[in-house]
């Protein structure tokens, strides 16, 4: 690089080396800080309108009462050390007749007529910031903290740069008014100075007033507000998780609220930019371990009942997500097969699309067991007949239809209202290990490595596509026409369910894939298998976002419909992960 020399005192010359290096270091830091600055601005601007509106209302009240400044100036007393303290100032109001004696004038000064209080509402002091774990509203019975001076030099709600500027303009205007009234007779001040011994009556705090210190939008700094929005309602401790595959340390149980198990779109305070950031996750944080103590086959999570269901051969254990313990060994319920026989055991379970019904099927059972989750207590509602068949896959539709895939290749359909068999679809042996229902089509895949599409209107196979390896898992995108397959050779394949001639291999692993599931928005999917990892992929490229190691092969997993929790089953334990965006 060619070097240039020029006197540092020359106007318009090259900066000295010390200033130049400092300038370059600042420029290099700009890209790193740009993202956080933009996010902070978005968070702060979202709350600035209501805050500024309240502020300008206060200024407007001040401008309408020119004598309010003089009365507030008399409300400041000076102590022995020069400090100021708040003191009560009475407001004179027309009483309907002229007062002629000095005693009556003093009595009038000591009274606060109700009409005057309505005409001149007082500014409320803002208590110091607190650290609430969740945003709450104060009741009318909450006690006030010690009152602060009316004119607070640094009010707690002025933390942003824009509001700080408005406050400075207001203080400048106040100082000018004080200078204009500085030549007035001081006898009036000495006359009312004795009133400083009176303390203001505690006023109840209103829920939307600036004195509500529990409101995080009023008491937090911009950086604290950014953290408030970035944290989940569950309030987990932030834990960085890189895509290198390092596992998060097991944390203490989290105290999440109902928002974790409810759709974020249903929350009235959710803004558009908050929804957009729930596109792809950044990490998984383990928050709980459920000790099932038997080899897990299937796990399911219900946002409706806020429970996790872990299925093994002997039965299904029900765990309450509200209980906050790091390692839970005591389930709420244990649902067992009604038939007690060594040759009878469960193989799979499934939650209905509305999370109100639990299905369970297995080997040598007389029927698929149906439990009613909407009832006050769990009970076996009915059994869907399938005697002599071994169930290995379950599915259901919103039209009160239940489906099951059996080892002999049969796909059976029941009407849940009558528990009667609607139709049997006969396929090759071991061809119905996986079931996916989409519109009027049933997609099946199994150990014969063939993907089949059954048309429910004609009750026959409309498509067969052969893959290179056995189909171990199936999942359909909730937003697009892509069907995702997990193969025994470790491949992820995307199959276009509408065009039916487009197959994309998007990722390859060294181990068998045992489970796949799309996110609710269809922007990513998660996969588990024999590789001892939970892997998160982006859609549609299949790029690996990050991995989370488990203690052993992950046979099964499930995800809540709002994309907030993932439940995995590895060996004899189920792990609850909080998805961090």
UniProtKB/Swiss-Prot annotation:
Keywords: Cytoplasm, Nucleus, Phosphoprotein, Repeat, Transcription, Transcription regulation, WD repeat. GO terms for cellular component: cell cortex; cytoplasmic lattice; cytosol; nucleus; protein-containing complex; sperm midpiece; subcortical maternal complex. A motif (Nuclear localization signal) lies at residues 132-138. Induction: Induced by E2A-HLF, a chimeric transcription factor containing the transactivation domain of E2A linked to the DNA-binding and dimerization domain of HLF. Induced during TNFSF11/RANKL-induced osteoclast differentiation. It comes from Mus musculus. GO terms for biological process: actin filament organization; endoplasmic reticulum localization; epigenetic programming in the zygotic pronuclei; establishment of spindle localization; flagellated sperm motility; mitochondrion localization; negative regulation of transcription by RNA polymerase II; positive regulation of embryonic development. Residues 90-134, 175-216 are annotated as: Disordered. Expressed in spermatogonia (at protein level). Expressed predominantly in ovaries, where it is restricted to growing oocytes, with greatest levels in fully grown oocytes. Expressed predominantly in testis, heart, lung, liver and muscle, and at very low levels in the brain, spleen and kidney. Expressed in bone marrow-derived macrophages and osteoclasts. Residues 175-204 have a biased composition (Basic and acidic residues). This is Transducin-like enhancer protein 6. WD repeats lie at residues 246-283, 291-329, 341-381, 384-424, 427-464, 466-505, 508-547, 549-580. InterPro entries: Groucho_enhance, WD40/YVTN_repeat-like_dom_sf, WD40_repeat_dom_sf, WD40_rpt. Signal peptide: none annotated. Contrary to other WD repeat Groucho/TLE family members, does not contain any identifiable Q, GP, CcN or SP domains. Only the C-terminal WD-repeat domain is conserved. Disruption phenotype: Females show normal ovarian histology, ovulation and egg morphology, however fail to produce offspring following successful mating. Progression from one- to two-cell embryos is delayed by 4-6 hours and embryos failed to develop into morulae and blastocysts. Embryos form unequal sized blastomeres due to smaller, dysmorphic, and displaced mitotic spindles resulting to asymmetric division. The gene is Tle6.
